[in-house]
Amino acid sequence: MKPIPKYIALLLVIIGFYACASTGMPDGGPYDETPPKFVRATPEPNATNNKRKKISIEFDEYIKLDKASEKVIISPPQNEAPEVKVSGHRVLVEFFDTLRENTTYTVDFGDAIVDNNEDNPLGNFAYAFSTGEHIDTMEVSGTVLSADNLEPVKGIQVGLHKNLEDSAFVKLPFDRISRTDSRGHFTIRGVAPGKYRIYALMDGNQNYLFDSKTEAIAFLDSLVVPDMRPDVRQDTVWNELDTLAYDTIYEVHYTRFLPDNLILRSFKEENPMQYLVKSEREQLNRFSLYFSAKADTLPTIKGLDFDEKDAFIIESNPRNDTIRYWIKDTVMCERDTLTFQMDYLATDTLGQLVPKTDTLRMVNKIDKKRRMALAEEAMKKEEKERKKRAKKGDTLKVEPKFFAMSVDAPSSLDLNRNIVLKFEEPVEHIDTEAIHMAVKVDSLWEDIPFILMADSVVPRQYQILADWQPGQEYQLKIDSLGIKGIYGLYTNKVENQLKVKTLEDYGTLYLNIVGAGPHAVVQLLNSSDGVVRQQPVTDKNTCDFYFLQPSTKYYIRLFNDDNNNGVWDTGNYEEKRQPEEVYYFPKVWEMKANFEFEETWDIHAVPLDKQKLDEIKKQKPDEAKKIKDRNKERARKLGRT
């Protein structure tokens, strides 16, 4: 027998190798799940009598800092920010301020220290030393929430003052400090025994004290007294392959630092500084004035190159901080510039409201020459189109120009709604005889009475109110020329037919409120945390919502309306007035047609930081690392489940 040629033998070996090999792709091995381990530090952790301003903290592998400017907190606060950097396996910290005597310093890294390859975080890592004989080790922790909507507040400073005077917050930097994470949580470390005031501050100028009304703040009325005690908690070792199964539950003995559940409600004070922010002539026929704060009165205008008497229709919002002036005279509208003297109240250097006079020039964005050129160009274009059509024997129909009006009268009208008329420009006159409402009775339309009412909040908006009956059909007619605008145009005719929904089309929610104040207001919210409807709690501590849409999710918020003005009000530090309290019902309702829900709500039953559902929070927690999940997925692919 002839020997097998070498190339055939080699081919057989290769075929045999592939026949025995796995058909899958080569596996690169498990992911690194181990965070960096602390090895040593100079000075040693919790060292006393330290005078060194340079710190070196070493780990067992190459590391990096993740978002150090957000996550690394140094206490007490420093006038000149220390330098924090990475060098291989080490974190280096250098202080530039003179170290204070007999003071505990903490460098809280949070989860900023991660390994160089997989970003595994060394969570909850902090380093401390003392310049004196003793090191302070107690902690104070809690959560900062936005007072008006219970959103977690990320990145706000939280500080302690040993000085218990109210003035300390506005005159002195904090003694100890921390910063909230994405969940609003904070931990102030290195705290000595004693009594403290606690504050939160969104410190825009980084001076660690409240000196600007634009800064969000929070404060507690009560003192904070740090304490600690031994405690036991249960911990769990989870199954590596099954996230729903655990291997072991064991007890962990630890030192619990108190208080650990403080709630601070963050708010911005009402801006007390009154001044003109800007003036703007948005269009030929109107201009607007914008002020920095709400006002009790409107400014007074005196024309310097025109007669201001009966010259404007004025629209202002409820705060009187945004005011729109519609110019009634069309000739006056065409003027490039309007100059006037404005008298109003403004805040002086002493913080007092005093009379002030400004001279303002309202300039058209497009001057008259350019406007005339544009108009001539449009006329030429129209004439060209007319001649083109004329050659074809076609005539260009001249469309009359009407006063623009939109009618919100849906074909299926909710029982708790009305027909709404909206106008782009102010209305001069409404002929109510030209408006007709009718109901269908045995296939015939019968006129019914109605009320036409101007909206008290929204300018240029009117509502048509009638005795809407469930399941009935209605007809709205508005004759042409029935409504006239201030520039002489009239509305076109309108005809709408609509049918009112039945009672069976809605769900109903009955609430029994426990723990609310004497003037509480309940707000029904949508999935964007926006207010759909609101109404006060009754003397019997009930609040009922009718005509709720089926297959719609509703959420509920309550605020204690202390001054009984129907709106939520912010706080004031100088007056020691907290913002009005807000609560969320930690539940969502998905309404059903022809279905009634009844619920008792104790507003204090669930801690404040657990009340607002995650699904409607805008401030989401930072994404946690999920390397272990990747290893579980790898195990499944390898058939090791």
Please tell me what each predicted stretch does.
Residues 2-641:
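N-terminal targeting or signal-anchor segments and their processing/structural boundaries
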